[in-house]
Amino acid sequence: MRVHVLYFADAREAVGRTEEWLEVPPGVATVGALRDHLCARGGPWAVLARRGTRFAINRAVAPGASAPIHDGDEIAVFPAISGG
């Protein structure tokens, strides 16, 4: 399966890229599994495991780590939004 991953804000700064097309191995079928796969790269990729990091699938916020991903999906990675 191949997905298009977009990185925003601190995720973009940490990993040093704005986007990539990623071939994911079998078994990576959810947002949580994709996050773990990316974090396994080590080093700056660990920022994606931070509490509050959010994911969107095809421009809709993923409801949780168990949200399924599919071939060709656009996955956005961004920090939690806060305000006041």
Predicted regions and their residues:
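Ubiquitin-like/PB1-type beta-grasp interaction modules and other compact soluble beta-rich domains
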Residues: M1-G83
